[in-house]
Amino acid sequence: MAQAPGIDKSKALEGALSQIERAFGKGSIMRMGERPTEQVDVISTGSLGLDIALGIGGLPRGRIIEIYGPESSGKTTMALHAIAEAQRKGGTCAFIDAEHALDPGYARKLGVDVDNLLISQPDAGEQALEIADTLVRSGAVDVLVVDSVAALVPRAELEGDMGDSHVGLHARLMSQALRKLTGSVSRSNTMLIFLNQIRLKIGVMFGSPESTTGGNALKFYASVRMDIRRIGSIKDKDEVTGNQTRVKVVKNKMAPPFRQVEFDIMYGEGISKVGELIDLGVKAGIVEKSGAWFSCDSQRIGQGRENAKQFLRDHPEMAADIERRVREQAGVVAEAMLVGPDEDGAEH
C-alpha cells in the first residue's frame, strides 16, 4: 500500500492510540486480539461461561453495567447471582426495586443473604437515583442494582394527569444522574448494575427496531452492556422446569466484546452450573459428545443432556475437575464464543 513519505505509520498509530486513551480512558480502544493486561477487581456473574465471555473473569467493580432484554428473560436472576457472589466474599449489597417486584423467597434460593441485603422501593425516579448516589458516595456498598431503568418515572410524570405529554423527561433524568454517578462509582469501586427493558421503535425499515428505555446516556456511560434472551424451554417430561438463555456481550470496555454464551436458568435454582460445565466442556474438548451420549476421559456420563447434568450433580468431584480444566482452557473457550456485532440482532 502507498505510504506518505516521511511518516512512520506504526509510531503515528501508537501516538494516536495513547492520545485516545489519555482523552477517553483505558480500554476505550484496543486491538480485538489483545488480552486484557490490567488486573481488574471483578465479581463473578454466577455463570462460568459468562465470566469467560467477559474476558476478565466476571463483572468489573468501579464500573456501570447494563443488563437488558425482554420480559422474563433472566435480568433480575443475573443481578441476584452477582449479589450472591459479592455477599459470599463478604461484600455489602443494595437493591433499588423501582418495579416493586423483588421476590425475597426466590432471591434466597439463588444464595442471596436477604437478611443483610439493603432494599429500597422508591416512589419516583429522582428519589431512586438520589438514594443510589448517596449509597455509592458512602463507599460502603460493593454492588448496587437498580431494577429497572424503565420504572424510574420522573416525579413530574407521576404528579401530572394521565395523557399529559412529558417528552424527553426520562432521558434527561438518566443523563443528569449518570453524569453525577459515573465519577462516584469509579472512586468508591462500587459496581452499579442497571437492569433495562426493551421497546420497539416505530417505522424502522432497516436494522433492529428494538431500543432500550431511558435515552442514550446509559449506552455511553456503561462499561459493559449485556443482551439477555430466552431462547427455549427445558422440559422434564411435559413439565417446563427452566429456560434456555443466551447472553451476548454487546459492549465491553474491559476486553474485546461480541462474545456470546448460552446457559440454563432453572426455576427455583437459577443458573445451572452443571449444564454449563457440559456445554463448555464440549467446546473445550474435555467432554466428548457422540450421538446422544456424553463422556469424559472415556467414561460415559449420560445419555442426553439432562441425564449428563444429573450425573455431574451426583459426582461433584468430576464436576470440579471439568470446571478446573475449562478454566485452564478459558482462551480456547472464549474464541469459540466470538460472534459478529450484528449476529443474532444488532446493538441497541
UniProtKB/Swiss-Prot annotation:
NCBIfam families the UniProt entry points to: tigrfam_recA
GO terms for cellular component: cytosol
SUPFAM superfamilies hit by this protein: P-loop containing nucleoside triphosphate hydrolases, RecA protein, C-terminal domain
Matching InterPro entries: AAA+_ATPase, DNA_recomb/repair_RecA, DNA_recomb/repair_RecA_CS, P-loop_NTPase, RecA-like_C, RecA-like_N, RecA_ATP-bd, RecA_C_sf
Example GO biological process: DNA repair
Family: Belongs to the RecA family.
Compartments where located: Cytoplasm
Domain of life from the UniProt record: Bacteria
Job of this protein: Can catalyze the hydrolysis of ATP in the presence of single-stranded DNA, the ATP-dependent uptake of single-stranded DNA by duplex DNA, and the ATP-dependent hybridization of homologous single-stranded DNAs. It interacts with LexA causing its activation and leading to its autocatalytic cleavage.
PROSITE patterns xrefs: RECA_1, RECA_2, RECA_3
GO molecular function: ATP binding; ATP hydrolysis activity; ATP-dependent DNA damage sensor activity; damaged DNA binding; single-stranded DNA binding
Record protein name field: Protein RecA
Keyword DNA-binding: yes
Signal sequence coordinates: none
